[in-house]
Amino acid sequence: MFCVQCEQTIRTPAGNGCSYAQGMCGKTAETSDLQDLLVAVLQGLSAWALQARELGIIDSQIDSFAPRAFFSTLTNVNFDSDRIVEYAKDAILLRHSLAVRCRLLDSTITVDHPLAELQLVADDIPSLLQQSQQFALNNDKADVGDDIHGLRMLCLYGLKGAAAYMEHAHVLGQSDEQIYAEYHAYMAWLGTQPRDVDTLLNNAMGIGKMNFNVMAILDQGETQAYGDPQPTSVNVRPVAGKAILISGHDLKDLHMLLEQTQGTGINIYTHGEMLPAHGYPELKRYPHLVGNYGSGWQNQQTEFAKFPGPILMTSNCIIDPNVGNYGDRIWTRSIVGWPGVNHLDGDNFAPVIEQALGMAGFPYSELEHLITVGFGRQTLLNAADTVIDLVASKKLRHVFLVGGCDGSRTERSYFTDFARSVPQDCIIMTLACGKYRFNKLDFGTLEGLPRLLDVGQCNDAYAAIMLAVKLSEKLGCTVNDLPLSLVLSWFEQKAIVILLTLLSLGVKNIYTGPTAPGFLTDNLMAILYEKFGMQPITTVEQDMQAILGH
């Protein structure tokens, strides 16, 4: 096993990365190694998809399958070895079918790629594990050096994050042929084990630019289906009655669950990155969507154990449900998996509903505690003139975007302290699950504008980017000239690709934490600082002084 993709990876003087029987996330060495094999198979599939495009063949099934299967290898998504193997088998079947179609047009065609003809050596996991050793991500690290290896991981993990957003968009009926073509090109290229520093850096930025377009179609899919988010009060305390908890990012799953639970007397609660759903008009119209439960994903083993109903996981993040003894009432969807728990293949949530009806639910309602969500793209753009007026009249000094991933590291208290320290003449935008570090605090208002604006899920960084672009256009300056600072927390691969997106757009002077990614060497961090001014967080006082100047 070798995995260095998340923030909690093992770090030692000898090197960074989880390389024992189990990773810090709970992923076994078996699952990790099989995921490496799956990635290699998917790289070969993408090589064929590129070749097919040259012949005018575009296989929409492959275009949707490839990023979905890649998504299953993200942190805290799928821990089920059998399902990882099934993805690899399906990929090879799709590749074979595509090759047949290509050879009907050109019987002599071959694909010049080291993984183009990769086959699984057997059906049994022990044999596949032996085969997977050929594709360990650190196999040639000693040969190419830490910097080249780190850049490869930056591209690979960034592309994983983009693949996740591609799948979220696909679920909502959104696709783009150019995006799929770029995805296959980057995926196939990574399978050649690239060694050129400039190419690696340029393609990392290319992946970021591609992801901007992915976030755009995802935003389009969400708003076309459910309307533009509106500022909405959300109760974060339990309400008496039977209950189902839904976690992850998939708004379509939430919509289907709300439809299927109408009239049952079951209350639906969001968790984690599903919180922003309350701002969408077509979702918040359901009266049994009663609130949000819990905090950051890392606390789920305690919080889920106390939840008196079934839990539906629609995407990341899932961690070991056996710790809290709730494995019998957690249900996984789509690419999510944990060995031995219930998995739903179709769109019928009847088993979940039946389980909820058989449980007690919450015995009483607690006193309401309301927070506000729903400051999405359109709401932010509509507020642009107000923001400009407040800045011009010197009533608004600075805007901070403080958000990103949450996690268990104690250093993450920095983000709570930072938000608390933001002066009263400044406002905070936040997004993703990092908001749980401070989103239940009362920040008040500034000239009628809430000082804390919850922009949405991690992919809603797109909304913040669009606001920054509009403000810069109206003020006749660059985004980097705005009184705007980004203080971002990262944990996994979606955060990596959002960072690449921001850098590819030329956004500079981003503060990141709580630690640097384990795959980025000191040399690479120095390059990112030199090119983009990106720097690790230090102390709240020091960083605030550097940003505001006093």
UniProtKB/Swiss-Prot annotation:
Binding, hybrid [4Fe-2O-2S] cluster: H249, E273, C317, C405, C433, C458, E492, K494
Essential cofactor(s): [2Fe-2S] cluster; hybrid [4Fe-2O-2S] cluster
Cofactor, free-text remark: Binds 1 [2Fe-2S] cluster.
Keyword annotations from UniProtKB, A to Z: 2Fe-2S, Cytoplasm, Iron, Iron-sulfur, Metal-binding, Oxidoreductase
Residue positions, PTM Cysteine persulfide: C405
Annotated GO MF terms: 2 iron, 2 sulfur cluster binding; hydroxylamine reductase activity; metal ion binding; peroxidase activity
Entry superkingdom: Bacteria
BP GO terms, sorted: nitric oxide catabolic process; response to hydrogen peroxide
EC number(s) on file: 1.7.99.1
Reaction(s) catalysed (UniProt annotation): A + NH4(+) + H2O = hydroxylamine + AH2 + H(+)
Entry binding sites for [2Fe-2S] cluster: C3, C6, C18, C25
Annotated compartments: Cytoplasm
InterPro entries per record: HCP/CODH, Hydroxylam_reduct, Prismane-like_a/b-sand, Prismane-like_sf, Prismane_a-bundle
Cellular compartments per GO CC: cytoplasm
Signal peptide: none
Family per record: Belongs to the HCP family.
HAMAP family linked to this entry: Hydroxylam_reduct
Protein role: Catalyzes the reduction of hydroxylamine to form NH(3) and H(2)O.
Name under which the protein is recorded: Hydroxylamine reductase
Gene name for this UniProt entry: hcp
